[in-house]
UniProtKB/Swiss-Prot annotation:
<dbReference type="GO" id="GO:0005829">
    <property type="term" value="C:cytosol"/>
</dbReference>
<dbReference type="InterPro" id="IPR042214">
    <property type="entry name" value="TruD_catalytic"/>
</dbReference>
<dbReference type="InterPro" id="IPR020119">
    <property type="entry name" value="PsdUridine_synth_TruD_CS"/>
</dbReference>
<feature type="active site" description="Nucleophile">
    <location>
        <position position="80"/>
    </location>
</feature>
<dbReference type="GO" id="GO:0031119">
    <property type="term" value="P:tRNA pseudouridine synthesis"/>
</dbReference>
<dbReference type="GO" id="GO:0003723">
    <property type="term" value="F:RNA binding"/>
</dbReference>
<dbReference type="Pfam" id="PF01142">
    <property type="entry name" value="TruD"/>
</dbReference>
<feature type="binding site">
    <location>
        <position position="329"/>
    </location>
    <ligand>
        <name>substrate</name>
    </ligand>
</feature>
<feature type="binding site">
    <location>
        <position position="129"/>
    </location>
    <ligand>
        <name>substrate</name>
    </ligand>
</feature>
<dbReference type="InterPro" id="IPR043165">
    <property type="entry name" value="TruD_insert_sf"/>
</dbReference>
<dbReference type="InterPro" id="IPR020103">
    <property type="entry name" value="PsdUridine_synth_cat_dom_sf"/>
</dbReference>
<dbReference type="InterPro" id="IPR001656">
    <property type="entry name" value="PsdUridine_synth_TruD"/>
</dbReference>
<keyword id="KW-0819">tRNA processing</keyword>
<dbReference type="GO" id="GO:0160150">
    <property type="term" value="F:tRNA pseudouridine(13) synthase activity"/>
</dbReference>
<feature type="domain" description="TRUD">
    <location>
        <begin position="155"/>
        <end position="303"/>
    </location>
</feature>
<protein>
    <recommendedName>
        <fullName>tRNA pseudouridine synthase D</fullName>
        <ecNumber>5.4.99.27</ecNumber>
    </recommendedName>
</protein>
<comment type="function">
    <text>Responsible for synthesis of pseudouridine from uracil-13 in transfer RNAs.</text>
</comment>
């Protein structure tokens, strides 16, 4: 299995180095739900600004404040403790009056707004995230500038970031140990982390192998293609290849890669054979996903940061702004720009 730091770069390995997250203010994330609260219902959606607090801890403190069980507080995604983040939490409070959230006290945390909502906010139920990042101590401004222009046009690999695999790859190692034993894992969080790490590692490996091909973005017979911004996909046939290629080139369609698991992978013929060969050596992780009945799915091979802009503060410091759809990683953008000093795994999704 190829480690995250050695996965194929779309624009070649960066020439220079830089520092990501010298302080929390260098990594700002704002959740984009993609909808507005209903204004009524048994749930309360809260938009919270936090710095120095992890999401689960804030959710637990909020549950105590509302005098409800911790399981009644949900969120769409984990956000980094060591960053400035705006995210939405959801509390189920049936039959209760609207609390006075001005009395909610937690250092580094502030309730910005709140409203009633009819439905629980579930994991992954957001449109995307807006990022403002500051990269410091950049050793090669010219190379970074060239790469930013290339990313604006050509995107980046849609890799799962190193943080998906845990500090030192602990989640992936946990998955491997679990796969090689028959012992049940009763901790639901561990199960989730380990299975996600296993499937994400296999996806990364498939993309890594495809990007080695000079014609990686050429549609082949049996490719699973996805309408940009949509979750469903369809299979390319040889008769349609010229027209489908035109739509891929215009970024109307995206070539996808497998999130392996049980059931059909989605590709057929030549494309399926390529994906199977790309992870043929990873039998242990594949067996785990089959054993635990994790359903196979698809994910776009490339990621195109939206609203990408940048501003050089000086020759060694640049501020980046961009928006990514839910499930995509800012660190996968940064790795195409600089060889980062620091550990990606400390940056939450």
């Amino acid at each position: 299995m190829t480690e995250f730091d050695n996965l194929t770069w779309l624009h070649g390995k960066p020439q220079g180095s830089g520092l990501l997250k010298a302080n929390p203010e260098d990594f700002v994330v704002v959740e984009d739900l993609g909808f507005t609260p209903d204004g009524e219902g048994e749930h309360i959606l809260l938009r919270i600004l936090k710095n120095g607090c992890n999401t689960r801890f804030v959710a637990d403190v909020l549950a105590k404040f509302l005098k409800i069980h911790a399981r009644e507080v949900s969120f769409a995604g984990q956000k980094d403790k060591h960053a400035v983040t705006e995210q939405w939490l959801c509390a189920r409070v049936p039959g209760k009056e609207m609390p006075d959230f001005s009395a909610f006290q937690l250092e580094g945390c502030k309730v910005l707004e709140y409203a009633r909502h009819k439905r629980k906010l579930r994991l992954g139920a957001l449109k995307g995230n807006a990022f403002t990042l500051v990269l410091r101590e950049i050793s090669d401004r010219r190379d970074v500038e060239t790469r930013l222009q290339a990313i604006r046009d050509g995107g980046v690999p849609n890799y799962f970031g190193a943080q998906r695999f845990g500090i030192g790859g602990s989640n992936l190692q946990g998955a491997l140990r679990w796969a090689q034993s028959n012992a049940p894992v009763r901790d639901r969080n561990k199960r989730s982390f380990w299975l996600s790490a296993a499937r994400s590692a296999l996806f990364n490996q498939i993309v890594h192998q495809r990007l080695k091909k000079p014609d990686f973005n050429q549609v082949v017979d049996g490719d699973a293609l996805q309408l940009a911004g949509r979750g469903s996909w369809f299979v390319a046939t040889s008769e349609e290849l010229p027209e489908l290629q035109r739509r891929v080139d215009e970024k109307e369609l995206m070539i996808t890669a497998s999130l392996p698991g049980s059931g059909e992978w989605g590709t057929q013929r030549a494309a399926l054979a390529f994906e199977q060969d790309a992870i043929a050596q990873e039998t242990v992780l594949q067996s785990l996903l089959l054993r635990e009945k994790v359903e196979a799915s698809r994910r776009a091979m490339l990621l195109y940061p939206q609203q990408l802009s940048w501003n050089w503060w000086d020759d060694v410091t640049v501020e980046l702004r961009f928006w990514l759809p839910a499930g995509s990683f800012a660190t996968s953008v940064v790795r195409e720009l600089i060889n980062t000093m620091g550990d990606y795994a400390h940056i939450a999704e």
